[in-house]
Regions:
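Amide-forming acyltransferase catalytic core, primarily the GNAT-like/NAT-type
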Residues: 1-74
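Acyl-donor binding region in acyl/amide transferases
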Residues: 72-130
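Soluble, non-transmembrane catalytic domains of enzymes that act on hydrophobic metabolites at membranes
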Residues: 23-42, 51, 58, 79-80, ...
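C-terminal functional modules
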Residues: 108, 116-157
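Compositionally biased, low-structure terminal segments
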Residues: 3, 9, 89, 139, ...
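Generic structural motif recognizing short loop/turn segments at the entrances and edges of beta-strands
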Residues: 44-45, 56-58, 63-65, 72-76, ...
């Protein structure tokens, strides 16, 4: 409701910055978890991260995890560093609490099957089909099954 009018939207933005202030990190994104785990994926160079600033995303820390999120309407998790089985419940509990304080009712994470983050989320939450990815191979030496994505690699993030 607050996001529907200009006056209240400004108040909500100030409130959300207050809620997120202690969690925010001065970064434009996080390293690609898929490439870190040995897959091929989007190179998150400084130029790429600068390009991604067109969208209101932020990097936050909850417990030991660093999470790249977009909280425009829902919370979209773009990618995560240091999300492990040992800290996952604590991280998700903290993220759910943050969503509650922001009045957000949905948290989404999208990634390619077969990655460690996919396996971690699939252990705790039901999976559902998401965005299809199609490839046209123009002679790349990288097999398509080795290419993986997370939500932050998509332009809508």
């Amino acid at each position: 409701l607050f996001k529907k009018t200009r006056l209240f939207n400004g108040i909500y933005k100030s409130y959300s910055r207050l809620v997120l202030r202690k969690k925010m990190l001065p970064e434009n994104g996080v390293a690609n978890s898929a490439t870190r785990d040995g897959f091929a994926g989007v190179s998150r160079s400084a130029v790429f991260l600068s390009y991604k600033t067109y969208s209101p995303t932020m990097v936050i820390r909850i417990a030991d995890a660093t999470i790249w999120i977009n909280s425009k309407n829902d919370i979209w998790i773009g990618d995560m560093e240091n999300g492990t089985e040992a800290n996952f419940k604590t991280v998700m509990s903290g993220l759910k609490r943050t969503a509650w304080w922001l009045g957000i009712r949905q948290i989404q994470f999208h990634c390619s099957p077969g990655t460690p983050l996919y396996q971690l989320f699939a252990k705790h939450f039901p999976e559902s089909p998401s965005y299809p990815v199609l490839f046209q191979d123009f002679g790349s030496p990288i097999p398509p099954e080795k290419i993986k994505f997370t939500f932050s690699d998509i332009d809508i993030f």
